[in-house]
Design a protein with these regions (language model features):
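Extended terminal accessory/targeting regions
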Residues: 2-193
Length: 193
């Protein structure tokens, strides 16, 4: 028994991930909030994304190492991407840059920014930047609050990947810490083109 406890302590990261997976499995098994109305997310094709180079060249050894350890890959939407939320079609225009789901670097081993949270992350980053979504034909959905943007993120990801527990963890992380990015975008006051 002490051997098992020693191993759990030694490999604590995997112990934590294993416990979270078990909780997530139980939550999905019993259908936590499966009957809840979601945003009805649909799309015709995956977004066409082009990676943007991480600028490590010319930074010197320590600067490049710092960029590699703390930076994250950014992506540019290569062509207009249409999607439906709450029965309305919206578009994220070509040229929009984002970093995938904004997952802390130390968690990238288990959760890729362009993995199961990609679709929600793309729509969410656009909603955070502009505080609205651009309708496919013309106009916008009107102003969105930070909470409404976070709910859209959560619901899109639940509809796409079915991992209720993971998506609620991500949602609550946004509710707790997302105000930093939200307020930063409000200061810049980006406008739709």
């Amino acid at each position: 028994m002490s051997f098992i406890i020693d191993q759990l302590i030694t490999w604590w990261q995997f112990t934590v991930v294993g416990i979270l997976i078990a909780i997530g499995f139980i939550a999905n098994l019993f259908g936590v909030d499966n009957d809840k109305e979601r945003v009805g997310f649909k799309y015709v094709e995956m977004p066409q994304l082009k990676p943007i180079r991480i600028p490590t060249a010319g930074k010197g050894f320590w600067g490049a190492l710092w960029m590699w350890l703390t930076g994250s890959r950014h992506w540019i939407v290569a062509s207009d991407w249409a999607f439906r939320v709450n029965g309305e079609w919206y578009v994220i225009p070509a040229g929009f840059q984002f970093d995938g789901a904004s997952i802390p670097k130390f968690l990238h081993t288990w959760l890729s920014p362009t993995g199961v949270l990609l679709m929600g992350g793309l729509v969410h980053d656009y909603a955070y930047k502009y505080a609205t979504l651009k309708k496919k034909d013309e106009g916008t959905c009107g102003p969105l609050t930070q909470k409404e943007s976070d709910v859209i993120f959560r619901d899109i990801n639940i509809e796409q990947n079915g991992f209720h527990f993971l998506n609620y963890l991500a949602y609550w992380a946004l509710r707790i810490g997302g105000f930093v990015a939200w307020n930063g975008h409000r200061k810049v006051n980006a406008k739709l083109k």
